[in-house]
């Protein structure tokens, strides 16, 4: 079996609910991440504080 077939078979094993979560089409169209509820300034400070 080629890699393409393996990839297609792997995708077919994912349920529609799991796919919705992966692509961010869940409840509100938002996939929650660690930075979802944080302000950009907080992350900018953390990224530049030690440079």
Curated annotation (Swiss-Prot):
<dbReference type="Pfam" id="PF04604">
    <property type="entry name" value="L_biotic_typeA"/>
</dbReference>
<dbReference type="GO" id="GO:0009986">
    <property type="term" value="C:cell surface"/>
</dbReference>
<keyword id="KW-0078">Bacteriocin</keyword>
<comment type="function">
    <text>Lanthionine-containing peptide antibiotic (lantibiotic) active on certain Gram-positive bacteria. The bactericidal activity of lantibiotics is based on depolarization of energized bacterial cytoplasmic membranes, initiated by the formation of aqueous transmembrane pores.</text>
</comment>
<dbReference type="GO" id="GO:0005576">
    <property type="term" value="C:extracellular region"/>
</dbReference>
<dbReference type="InterPro" id="IPR007682">
    <property type="entry name" value="Lantibiotic_typ-A_Lactobact"/>
</dbReference>
<feature type="cross-link" description="Beta-methyllanthionine (Thr-Cys)">
    <location>
        <begin position="33"/>
        <end position="38"/>
    </location>
</feature>
<keyword id="KW-0929">Antimicrobial</keyword>
<protein>
    <recommendedName>
        <fullName>Lantibiotic streptococcin A-M49</fullName>
    </recommendedName>
</protein>
<feature type="propeptide">
    <location>
        <begin position="1"/>
        <end position="25"/>
    </location>
</feature>
<dbReference type="GO" id="GO:0005102">
    <property type="term" value="F:signaling receptor binding"/>
</dbReference>
<dbReference type="GO" id="GO:0042742">
    <property type="term" value="P:defense response to bacterium"/>
</dbReference>
<comment type="similarity">
    <text>Belongs to the type A lantibiotic family.</text>
</comment>
<feature type="cross-link" description="Beta-methyllanthionine (Thr-Cys)">
    <location>
        <begin position="42"/>
        <end position="50"/>
    </location>
</feature>
<keyword id="KW-0044">Antibiotic</keyword>
<feature type="cross-link" description="Lanthionine (Ser-Cys)">
    <location>
        <begin position="35"/>
        <end position="49"/>
    </location>
</feature>
<dbReference type="GO" id="GO:0031640">
    <property type="term" value="P:killing of cells of another organism"/>
</dbReference>
<keyword id="KW-0425">Lantibiotic</keyword>
<keyword id="KW-0883">Thioether bond</keyword>
<keyword id="KW-0964">Secreted</keyword>
<feature type="modified residue" description="2,3-didehydrobutyrine">
    <location>
        <position position="48"/>
    </location>
</feature>
């Amino acid at each position: 079996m080629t890699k393409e077939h393996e990839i297609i078979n792997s995708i077919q094993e994912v349920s529609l609910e799991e796919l919705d979560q992966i692509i961010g089409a869940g409840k509100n169209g938002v996939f929650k991440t660690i930075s979802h509820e944080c302000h950009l300034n907080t992350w900018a400070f953390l990224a530049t504080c030690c440079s």
